[in-house]
Regions:
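Non-catalytic cap/lid and distal C-terminal segments of serine-dependent acyl enzymes
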Residues: 1-451
């Protein structure tokens, strides 16, 4: 269940088998003869079928992605071409199956699922959405928070640094833990799925410091476990902790939507009090149950796609709770259909209530100079880049410190998220006293700095 889908034996095996079978099939087609004089050679027939199928696939994928915007964002040309290539491959092998007989036909039939599987793995490698076989079926290997003992904060981060210099740190594991937990919906009554949390080594000691918090939100469709896995959270945080005496932020990944196909708009609406859940229930629970710092400067919210939108609408509305924003590939406004439809279905016709949730409006109304925005977008996601620039301008007008990053070679995908959050973690760590940044943002290899 934990075998990787984006690297290693699974994709290599599938791609390898597909390539070998395809080569054998092409040789078989080349050696075949037309049954009747005047008919096209079977290989030519298959090639024509591939071209026609690929062209049709390219057109349909482009229409779905960029014209009708079925998924709300463009799929990006690498994905569109991968899908078109896969459909071309299917067209080729189906035509081969029709023209061939015996073992060669059987090979062509077997190639159909192999080509489809290779195409799916190719698309997944571009997005980085499903990291393991287990993520396809919602499997998570993580234990419950109730399976371990977590102690209350016994010192500040500064005290921890002092003990580290003296060589008198309390015992702790070499790596942190990812755990699941049901966070009570005491104030919101919002129906949420299990949350995920990452506790760094320092948080697992018997005398932990009061640590900063990153409250991170997945996209929609998505889930807390998807963010943990696709965001490579554990490995990123463990690598940071290894360089900082076991210190890293505690990561909270609550569920902002209730289910994969639902969009809560991260607001208190007729369809659930998501804002109260995220900013009251989750925060109060963490401050009561985990060794976390209390001040707003020590709290950040971040997210991908819809989770990034939630970040830019919620953080400025709650400056008493959050001091930093780390959105990636976010939207200009909460989106689930037209504005008129959302106003009616979510806000009972109250347009003002919806407008208050639009990030630039929220930033202008209640954003403060004490807050800071660290944001990024994939190079191929032009819409998200435009959104980022607009929101960044609003943040500057509110007096916020603003950093904008572009991730070359990525689009609306988890590769962009990982690339932005790596320097984002160092930035937030310096901001909260965990450790100083050892290089400038321009020295990080996977990002380009706009501001």
């Amino acid at each position: 269940m934990e075998l990787s889908l984006v690297r290693g034996i699974v994709p290599r095996t599938v791609f390898g088998l597909t390539a070998i079978a395809a080569i054998i099939l092409i040789i078989g087609l080349a050696l075949s003869k037309s049954k009747k004089r005047g008919r096209l050679h079977p290989l030519i027939v298959s090639l024509i079928a591939a071209v026609l199928a690929g062209a049709a696939g390219l057109l349909v994928a482009w229409l779905v992605s960029d014209v009708f915007m079925v998924f709300g964002v463009s799929l990006g040309w690498p994905v569109i071409f991968t899908i078109a290539g896969g459909i071309a491959g299917v067209g080729f092998v189906i035509a081969a199956a029709v023209t061939l007989r015996g073992v060669r036909r059987a090979l062509a039939v077997v190639l159909v699922p192999l080509v489809l599987l290779s195409t799916a793995l190719g698309v997944d490698s571009i997005y980085g959405e499903y990291q393991t076989i287990g993520t396809l079926v919602g499997y998570t290997p993580y234990a419950s928070l109730g399976s371990i003992e977590v102690h209350k904060a016994a010192m500040s981060v500064s005290d921890w640094h002092s003990k580290a210099r003296k060589g008198s740190l309390p015992s702790m594991p070499s790596q942190g833990k990812v755990l699941t937990v049901d966070i009570p919906n005491t104030e919101s009554n919002f129906t949420a799925r299990k949350a995920m949390i990452y506790l760094p080594p320092a948080a697992l000691s018997d005398r932990p410091p009061a640590l900063p918090v990153m409250e991170l939100l997945a996209g929609q469709p998505g889930s807390p476990s998807r963010l943990i896995d696709a965001g490579n959270i554990a490995a990123t945080m463990n690598a940071y902790a290894a360089k900082h005496d076991g210190l890293a932020p505690i990561v909270l990944v609550p569920d902002q939507n209730g289910e994969a196909t639902h969009n809560s708009l991260c607001a208190d609406t007729t369809q659930g009090n998501a804002e109260t859940y995220l900013t009251t229930d989750v925060v109060n629970w963490a401050k009561k149950m985990l060794p976390v710092a209390k001040s707003a400067r020590m709290w950040a919210m971040g997210g991908f796609s819809q989770g990034g939108t939630c970040t830019t609408q919620l953080v400025p509305r709650h400056p008493d709770i959050y001091g930093a924003l780390l959105p990636v590939d976010g939207e200009l406004k909460p989106t689930n259909g037209s504005v008129a439809k959302m106003v009616q279905e979510y806000f009972a016709g109250d347009r003002k209530a919806y407008d208050e949730q639009v990030p630039v409006n929220a930033i202008a109304a209640t954003g403060t100079p004490e807050q800071a925005l660290f944001t990024g977008a994939g190079e191929r996601d032009k819409e998200s880049i435009s959104n980022m620039r607009t929101i960044a301008d609003a943040a500057r007008k509110a007096g916020m410190e603003v950093t904008e990053l572009i991730v070359p070679g990525t689009g609306h995908d988890w590769h962009a998220v990982q690339a932005v959050w790596r320097p984002g973690l160092d930035w937030f760590g310096e901001r909260t006293g965990l450790g100083e940044m050892t290089k400038s943002l321009k020295e990080y290899p996977q990002v380009e700095v706009l501001q």
